[in-house]
Amino acid sequence: MHYSFTEKKRIRKSFAKRANVHNVPFLLATQLESYHDFLQEDKIPSQRKNEGLQSAFTSIFPIVSHNGFARLEFLSYVLGDPPFNIKECQQRGLTYASPLRAKVRLVILDKESPTKPVVKEMKEQEVYMGELPLMTSTGSFVINGTERVIVSQLHRSPGVFFEHDRGKTHSSGKLLFSARIIPYRGSWLDYEFDPKDILFFRVDRRRKMPVTILLKAIGMTPEQILENFFVFDDFTLHADGAEMKFVAERLRGEVARFDITDKAGKVLVAKDKRINSKHVRDVEAAGIKQISVPEDYLLGRILAKNIVDADTGEVIASANDELTDDLLARLREGKISHIQTLYTNDLDQGGYISQTLRMDDTNDQMAAKVAIYRMMRPGEPPTEDSVEALFNGLFYNPDRYDLSAVGRMKFNRRIGRDSLTGDMTLSNEDVLAVIKILVELRNGRGEVDDIDHLGNRRVRCVGELAENQFRAGLVRVERAVKERLGQAEADNLMPHDLINSKPISAAIREFFGSSQLSQFMDQTNPLSEITHKRRVSALGPGGLTRERAGFEVRDVHPTHYGRVCPIETPEGPNIGLINSLALYARLNEYGFLETPYRKVEGSKVTDQIDYLSAIEEGRYIIAQANATIDKAGMLSDELVSAREAGETILVSPERVQYMDVAPGQVVSVAASLIPFLEHDDANRALMGANMQRQAVPCLRPEKALVGTGIERTVAVDSGTTVQALRGGIVDYIDAGRVVIRVNDDEAQAGEVGVDIYNLIKYTRSNQNTNINQRPIVQVGDRVAKHDVIADGASTDLGELALGQNMLVAFMPWNGYNFEDSILISEKVVADDRYTSIHIEELSVVARDTKLGAEEITRDISNLAENQLARLDESGIVYIGAEVTAGDTLVGKVTPKGETQLTPEEKLLRAIFGEKASDVKDTSLRVPSGMVGTVIDVQVFTREGIPRDKRAQQIIDDELQRYRLDLNDQLRIVEGDAFQRLEKMLVGKVVNGGPKKIAKGTKITAEYLADLDKYHWFDIRPSDDTSANALEAIKESIAEKRHQFDLAFEEKRKKLTQGDELPPGVQKMVKVYLAVKRRLQPGDKMAGRHGNKGVVSRILPIEDMPHMADGTPADVVLNPLGVPSRMNVGQVLEVHLGWAAKGLGLRIGEMLNTQVQIAELRKFLAAIYNESGKTEDLDSFSDAEILELASNLKNGVPFATPVFDGADEGETRRMLDLAYPDHIAKQLGMTASKNQVTMYDGRTGEAFERTVTVGYMHYLKLHHLVDDKMHARSTGPYSLVTQQPLGGKAQFGGQRFGEMEVWALEAYGASYVLQEMLTVKSDDVNGRTKVYENLVKGDHVIDAGMPESFNVLVKEIRSLGIDIDLERD
């Protein structure tokens, strides 16, 4: 068994009963693959598939001019290098993007050519097409300096859908069937029945029209229409009646309207009897082919064909005419003997199309097309050309209508065609086929579609969304190019004169900047990042809206199994509309979600893994992952629990065709991080999954004692940790860098094998949390490829660590844990367990105003000395300064307009002879309630404006740092090269070299040591291989030096050039403050099971309840929070955490008493190898066992995977192992070892009952009291009501609302109430009067009329009611 570098240091004991058969796929694959397929950057133009950008270009080009003599053809596109890297874009507020250039060819044809078109001239050119944002390696985009995520959209798949209204439209509850053809791009075509069973169609939800108009418009005659939808009855007319061709099947269920007799005259079915199967058999046995029917049997029947007089050619009757006595008489007159009528009945062969045809008043194809034109363009006069153009453009023009490959596949599959490919536009056969199926549905045959089935909803990823947007931009360009192409020849234009890239840039910018699906990345912790990128939303353009989405769309559907998580979704109006991908889900080529299953053949479970989409899954019987399998891999139970077409059934093993790959395949990443999820109620599990995403990274992350085993995957895939790209030995580390000397077998020949990893230090995330990476390797450590070498935010030894392990006691304590409040020990705060660092970015801009330029300066009048002390000569705060609310960070003055001077100002100006008041102080100050340390300052200056000293100093420091970095890299690279060189040269025979070494001499290490290293290259080895290798290394070092010099020069150029700033901005300064937030009352905390609460009190350690050995609890929770919430998982977690800590203490004790290694190995084997997944501890050396043990002494981490976790017996065994009887007795444990006797810290007395105590992984959430609490002194008022504004951002007050008024009324506090509703609120004159009275020392309130009363009066007047206030 292979262990990675970090796994060896701390193995998580797994209780999984089932071996891992399929690894969790890379969690960000959906986003990265989608955008990669969109760009196809790594493919040469000739090998690019017709998708993404390539598809967008080929669908628009070639663009042909209106006269047809000039065209612009697309050849290929290329993406340039982005001008700035990701970090620089974030600092400067730029978009991380590549310039896109397309190679196009302008072809001009000879107008004079008499024969076929002759090319007159061709011009090829690369044209700039705007900038395309690039995706970072972690699946996000940097847009205007902030990281954003494009969320995938779950929308209704293109294709055809049949549904009914569930009886909601008509009062009788009759089902009204409808069908809808949804293209990927173009007009929607709807068919629907009305309550009278007439079939209508509508285009793009416009006015409805009879469907036969559409059928006529596609070229069908009434006869053809009836022939396609009905079977016919044949009649031969006689003078006194008729004979009907007998079809026995059509009689069943009918009531006989006359006696049916055989040839001998025997009555087989008597009149008015219902014909059953026996009657049909009797009639067939009698061999009857024709039946005589009375004349009234024909009346009311509908003719199927036009009837024409053979002699005169006159139409006697038209198709769809009803037979009447008159018509029959005319037919006999015309000597018509044979007629066909439509066969209809009330049960399963309705005459719907015939009735619709009767309503239709159009006569021919043109009239039908004109009717459609009038419906689409009311008020416009139809001409023949415009009518044809509109009709063909609706469904038959590839430029305006695109069903897409998915739509065609879904369409063909639904209407029962064998081929899944075809044209991307509709054909006449398609239109007809859909109507036929809809009529069949109305006749009671077939099933309607379930629109919430995941086979009918597909996912649009970043690549596809960006492609649609890019295509929209290209369409705008196409229009402009068409106009200009006509002048191309006359004006001798080049391709770049024709194409204006602005519409494309605007479309792309709008999509990435302000689309509903382009969201500000949730970067609170690594889990929130990864979840945001795996999110699928039903909202957004072309999707649903919150208001219109019903209950069914939001509900969990059987097809969600293994594709979309049934647990993780927001609470509130978006519930069920925003979902998360399940752990193993992926997208197929059509964009449908699919999930992996193991193939089962003849009840044997194979290792073959197939991905099935929701539609494919419906055809199979699939067993669950927890089905019992014997050693031979056979399903051993008599009956196996399985799923078939969404239903759970019990089947025999032989019928099973597939089996789940893992028990946790149903849930998403966040839900799979909850241990004992199977014991939690779904509502609370939802809260648990959502709240983990809000956990703030702690100062010192601590791994969860009870995890699920997926923590490592999440930490690595999120990109927060640093992984080794190649294996090797750690050569050098410091806080900001790790250097690895690559293994010889992984380094390429002649290349200098050194990898340098620069770590992210104290960087601000989107949510102002701190991103900081720390190395977890030491010099000399050997690491393999993909090993974790540095931890990031919220990770501990390469595992996700969102919170801290707290010793939790479930007991009430003086009401401080009433209603989910949390009582916390002071020790937790003192040890900085939940302290987090938040980085705030404060910025100020100096603009060019009408009155003159604003200036960033230290020279500000009326600024206190202690404030100035922190500013340098440029007026910018020093790094390292500790600042509090109101302190000046950047001094700035703004020119002020000339105003009337007061006498005092006139005096000052007379004395000092200067303008003392023409500028006002607009400095950047620390906002209220913030205390922190300045950790970084960035100064950006527009091109052409001289830099101040601070800006220059920042650039010089950055360049110096970069040069040191490069020098270090060069030193390491050269050191590595010379080391390899020495290894190669020692012992080799030379032809000559420095220090007059004789030919044929062997090189020794001493000889090399005496030489200057650069003279080694002058040695001439006798064998060619060594000589070539020597030359290669020499060139490699020279090349590296050259690269480093170029890199430095490029960096210098970037730093010294002016910065891109918004219009009118001369200079911008950004100051970064690090704020340390300790845990305090009012902060929100939560476990992983939805057990959330607010810290009510931080209690001195001596008052906390403690155990017999004096260990105090860290957290006291209310036991009443468990039963009604039904999240028992937290109790099981506490028990297992208690065992984990106890085992750690025992290992620590063994290390302290220095027991034999063999005994330590035996104890570790008892923990790891007696149940669940076993570990290969024998492969560990003694040193590795000791290192493992020392990492376990704070607790042995457990993994209890979702739906496959530890059972009661295993928890009990671990508790017995952790707390032998003598320890259990000392601690006053119960026999089960689940509860402990606790003592009151204040009195020292034992509590009456034993208490459940153990370790729970507890999180501090991003809802911190510091961000929410503020106090208002004097602040802004609302313009209309003159009441104080609300909210922290507006420096507002608390609203004294209706219920608060009741409270004061109840107390009879009339004067308090009066001042609350008047002078403290919106009585403008009263407010001023109170201030005047206070200044005079007269403490009297003169309450006047509140402004809100005047507003009320005005509103009543606006209703037209004259209302006036009568004053006494």
UniProtKB/Swiss-Prot annotation:
This is DNA-directed RNA polymerase subunit beta. It catalyses: RNA(n) + a ribonucleoside 5'-triphosphate = RNA(n+1) + diphosphate. It comes from the Bacteria. GO terms for cellular component: DNA-directed RNA polymerase complex. Belongs to the RNA polymerase beta chain family. The RNAP catalytic core consists of 2 alpha, 1 beta, 1 beta' and 1 omega subunit. When a sigma factor is associated with the core the holoenzyme is formed, which can initiate transcription. Its EC number is 2.7.7.6. It is an enzyme of class 2 (transferase).
